């Protein structure tokens, strides 16, 4: 059946393909499990405010973007959200869209919003009239093919991976009789008759479906969301291709495949769904605009965030118990800004007044592509927004290291061959019968969590091509300035990357360092330590005004965020003169780990005391070995003195920054355009996985199966799941992550911040549309000014509401 009527103009190919491109870019990318990183699920909607994005995603995904109103009502009743917070959020909302009076807003809080429903696809309409779950059938057949096509080494017999996605799918679909058995006669033939070129196929399907120009983008977006993580994985391929100046058509190929299914269903069910389909097209063609209900929800969300901001401000201005000794520090230790470091840093500093800690992006400013010992795989250990500029490998280029590298490669090949033998279709049966008893001891050891996993300890990294002195010097100067570490060096300076230590966890890489692209951060830290210990670099640093004392030694370390153990790579730069310093540092780190584990045990289910935590890392059945970044609420770029000693409960990204040392505000620009953006991706992934877990969450860990080595499905099939598992945001009884958009606090002149936002419209959009909140701190560390959008600021509320807020618990 052809839905086009003589009076309905067919969109031009350019209009049609541009709509397909916009829909593709509205989908967030999904990184494979080997290097999974947090991704902002609203990446395609940051150019519009929350209320408008809620309207858009309700149409295309049938999801809310805020919590149920009862969640806000409970907090209003308890005083956690004060009436003043609600009033301030109400007054900041656009007058034309908000409720007419504050009283009407308060009444709206007591009534639950309507259940969100997506505009139907033809598969939805066919299900309703035929009683057959066509959306499930479509998703099942596409997933069955996609899990093989996108496979990255898990399948022993991968098939159909040659060529573009659309072409590969046509080869499989023309021989798949499942749709015809389900009742869609002639489907295989219709696929064979479809144009061989994906763009031509899109044009043909749009004509058959009778779509008008205004409906295209929303309809295309809707179809891509029905494919779950598969469309996000395809979007990742486009993202990666564009980093190197190329392109990839996988996501539009998936759209083409989904359109062919829609056209086939129209051919079958057109006469009985014609009226409903025309109504759906009209709904897709409607402009996206926020409804009054969307605006109410956005106001409630902002009120909750204002309440959290007040608690944060009260914490920062409270009396700090921190003791800071005058003179040269006894120990300096730089950590990643990751919120998990906040607990450990506070514990470490409490042990001695001479200990100073710093916060900096965990890749330490080194965008490297690293090849591990005995491997040819290049790991991009840097933020996913960037591409590697330096390539490194493990071990010096000596005969002994080369021989060890070769031996490691041979061992790895033998292990891979043995693994494939164990899993092969025929030999697997004989293997279990013959060799099963040999594995009893290993099974018991691993099952009981008796095996301990050592920290990564490859030979020290080195650039594959030697870096000249100017390059090394430039790196050292820029990184030390970015860390605000240009004077007052201790005898021992530790550079601590971080990683996780878990077993039986497909999402293990998501617990590693996001700034290192989902890998642990020790490689970057070890490389930076070697640069900063270089005598030639030290000499030239002095000429640049950065005087590093002769007796200062930089060493790398790795903070295990699961167990709070810290491993120092002292052998990289062995120094007899610093042996006692290293020993003392190890004692302090051990004590800090005990304190940090004790604090973390209070939040972890079934962890009664700190010593329970290390076993959780080795427990096959443990769903929550750590909370990762759950609870993240703030990003603070300021001198450590502003936050030292204040209990931020592991909820804040802490980046050391002193604007007085930042000539030209280049470091400030770097912070706003890199770490802040990465932190926003993390915060919004947790937000999306909490408020809309069905679409932006990975589902139930108990049901996860890895497919293709790239992602997880629930059970034995279905759509690829993206985002965070439910157990990462919920403890089984209540949410452990409070869904709040990140508050960014920066101690710097407002004019400098505004100039940077003006130069970076994509970053500015995050603040203008309130995907992030922005505050400027004054010289006393107070949240003095709030960014209100359009490069404007307002003075924050002072003490006039202190009585009302005093009823609330200060974090």
UniProtKB/Swiss-Prot annotation:
One of its GO terms (molecular function) is zinc ion binding. It is found in: Cell inner membrane. GO terms for cellular component: plasma membrane. Keywords: Cell inner membrane, Cell membrane, Membrane, Metal-binding, Transport, Zinc. Its cofactor is Zn(2+). It is a peripheral membrane protein. The keyword Plastid does not apply. InterPro entries: DabA. Belongs to the inorganic carbon transporter (TC 9.A.2) DabA family. Part of an energy-coupled inorganic carbon pump. Forms a complex with DabB. This is Probable inorganic carbon transporter subunit DabA. It comes from Azorhizobium caulinodans (strain ATCC 43989 / DSM 5975 / JCM 20966 / LMG 6465 / NBRC 14845 / NCIMB 13405 / ORS 571). The lineage of its organism: Bacteria, Pseudomonadati, Pseudomonadota, Alphaproteobacteria, Hyphomicrobiales. The gene is dabA.
